[in-house]
Structures are given as structure tokens and as C-alpha cells.
A protein has these predicted regions:
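C-terminal accessory "lid"/substrate-recognition subdomains
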Residues: 1-13, 166-285, 332-334
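Phosphate/Mg2+-binding loops and adjacent switch elements
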Residues: 87-211
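Conserved beta-strand elements of the Class I
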Residues: 80-84, 159, 231-235
Length: 334
């Protein structure tokens, strides 16, 4: 689903007040159900530190690079940190570890990306996945996208917020992008990772006020390499494809055309063949995100550029201060 434009506007004609009013009863029910589930579900204590990386809104905010950063950092310290995810878009319900022969159709695209850096478990029931991971020697669990999931007791919760979109119009789905009411979502977070489009981006004053009283760690996504030379035909099926296109341009990519797809879009052979044909009209090469690249049919991947990014924290000291008690608890004793 592509998010409607009125989700991004708080007032005026672009905010579509009539549509918002019509949707508000459904939003109330959705928000009530989310709050009730969180309040009434007894969280399971797996006996290990659990770091949750979540968000308050629907769509992409940059959670996956944050999870990768945490997994790599913890494992560099000799800690057996593992990822835990629902496996959105995959058919396997788990609990099961992700293996190299799995496809996005099996476990989803995000688990495949995470599994390049650390062991990852896919489980529809997060509590079941945590138990399974612990039985295989996990010492810390990093849970991807579990802020609204109360099944597992969390030790530390990071809420990733897109600095450009913020919390949209501040309404709960479907009248807005929020997964639940904003205040409870912020109250359960230990810190907010504010994902900026670039290091010099100025944060909106309204968003600054909304985050008042929160521990805020500014961050941004930086490419691991420069864009390929020559003309590029860019495509992406992520939460906000324009972020990928804009970033490519900002770093010098010569984009002649762009093609957005729905988030987690399952590419078929004919999709890629059509893209190759369109790119050839411009004498351009195809480029996409890492997350899209793992969803491409295997036979086409070599012909498509993948442009990886990683997260850069502007206040790494605060991040490490928050992680320190967990590291102390899980680090192997000498």
C-alpha cells in the first residue's frame, strides 16, 4: 500500500479533513484495539536482554540499518547477539533460524539482510522465537519491529522516527500513519533515533516539540559506496521509495527515470524483464536498494546494481551509554 498524501498534512486542504473525519471512527477502533492488546497481554521474560527497534508509524523509517548496526557492534564485543523478526512477507511462521538457502518468499526480505551479519530467527510468536534463540545460545536478542508487540518483555526500546515525515498528521491508521496513539508509544520508548535524510537537515519545530522530554539520538543513512557511473534507472519497493531516489541523486547518481513499487513488492520475472527493457531505452543500468535486491528472482540479480547504506549516529556516546548495562550483563566473563 502506498501511503495517502493527506497522512503528511496536519491542516489545510491537503489534510483532507472530510476524509479524515469519515475515517476517524475506524481509527478509534484500531487505536483502542492496539492499546487493549498491549495492556492485557502478559509479556514473557525470556531471561535475556531484549533490545527492541521499532517505530510509531506505518512504512519505512530506517529500522533495518539500526538493527544491523546493533547486531554487528554487539558481536564485535564477543557477545552472541541474534536478530528476531516476524518475517513479514515470508510464508514461514517459525520459530526457525534463517539459512543461506532461504528466499524472501520463505522468510521475508529483512531477515535475509540481517542474516548477512548475524544469526536471525523468524517467528510469528516473538516469545516462541526468543525461547528458541536462547536454547541455541543467544545472549542478547535484537528484535526488529516489535514496539507494538507485547509478547516479549523488553529491556531497551529504540523508537526510530523519520525526521522528514515525523508522525504525519498525528492520527491513527487509517486516518493517519500512526500504529497507535502517539503518547503511549513515546512513553514506552527509552530513546528516539531520529533518522535524518542528510547530516545538515533542519528538524521541524513541531516534531521537536513532540519529542520534548525524550532522549533523542540524531542519525542518518550513509551509502557504503558511491553510485555507479553512467545513467541509472532506479526502482524500489520500500516504505518510502523517494528517500532512496533522493539519496541517490544527492550522492551524484545520474538517474534518468525512477519506478516506485509497493513496500515489500514481490518481483516477478516479467517485472524485471520490463525494467531491463525500459532501462535500455535510456542506455541506463538498473539500480535498487539492498532490501529490494534480495527479493529479485535469482537469475536477474547479477544484472542489477544494489546500493547498500549503513546508519551513522551523531551522538554515539548517548547510544553507548544506553547499551552499557546490557553489554555488561551479556559480555563473556574473563
Amino acid at each position: 500500500m502506498r501511503p495517502p498524501e493527506f497522512w503528511n498534512h496536519r491542516e489545510g486542504r491537503d489534510a483532507a479533513p472530510m476524509i479524515r473525519a469519515l475515517l476517524s471512527p475506524i481509527s478509534w477502533i484500531y487505536g483502542w484495539a492496539a492499546a487493549r492488546r498491549i495492556k492485557t497481554t502478559e509479556s514473557y521474560d525470556v531471561g535475556l536482554p531484549v533490545i527492541c527497534v521499532g517505530n510509531a508509524t506505518l512504512g519505512g523509517t530506517g529500522k533495518t540499518p539500526v538493527v544491523i548496526y546493533l547486531l554487528k557492534s554487539l558481536r564485535r564485543l564477543g557477545i552472541e547477539a541474534v536478530g528476531l523478526t516476524r518475517g513479514y512477507g515470508g510464508q514461514e511462521k517459525g520459530p526457525m533460524p534463517v539459512h543461506k538457502n532461504h528466499t524472501a518468499a520463505d522468510v521475508g526480505d529483512e531477515p535475509l539482510l540481517l542474516a548477512r551479519h548475524a544469526p536471525v530467527w523468524v517467528s510469528a510468536g516473538r516469545d516462541d522465537g526468543a525461547r528458541a534463540a536462547r536454547s541455541r545460545g543467544a545472549k542478547i536478542i535484537v528484535m526488529d519491529d516489535g514496539h507494538q508487540n507485547p509478547q516479549l518483555e523488553k529491556t531497551l526500546t529504540f523508537l526510530v522516527v523519520d525526521a522528514e515525515m515525523g508522525f504525519g498528521n498525528g492520527c491513527v491508521f487509517p486516518a493517519g500513519p500512526l500504529r497507535e496513539k502517539l503518547n503511549p508509544s513515546l512513553e514506552r520508548a527509552d530513546a528516539v533515533i531520529l533518522m535524518k535524510p542528510s547530516p545538515d537537515y533542519d528538524i521541524d519545530e513541531h516534531l521537536t516539540q513532540q519529542l520534548k522530554g525524550q532522549i533523542v539520538i540524531p542519525a542518518y543513512l550513509a551509502p557504503s559506496t558511491t553510485p555507479p557511473r553512467g545513467k541509472l534507472y532506479a526502482f524500489a519497493g520500500i516504505g518510502r521509495p523517494n528517500k532512496f531516489f533522493d539519496s541517490l541523486r544527492r550522492h551524484g547518481g545520474d538517474i534518468v527515470e525512477e519506478m516506485p513499487y509497493a513496500d515489500h513488492y514481490k518481483y516477478k520475472d516479467e517485472d524485471i524483464e520490463s525494467l531491463f527493457l525500459l532501462a535500455s531505452e535510456y542506455e541506463a543500468s538498473l539500480i535498487t536498494t539492498e532490501k529490494d535486491h534480495v527479493r529479485l528472482p535469482k537469475g536477474y540479480r547479477k544484472g542489477v546494481h544494489s546500493w547498500p547504506v549503513s546508519v551513522v549516529f551523531e551522538d554515539e556516546l548517548t547510544l553507548r551509554r544506553l547499551l552499557h548495562p546490557i553489554i555488561e550483563q551479556a559480555q563473556p566473563k574473563k
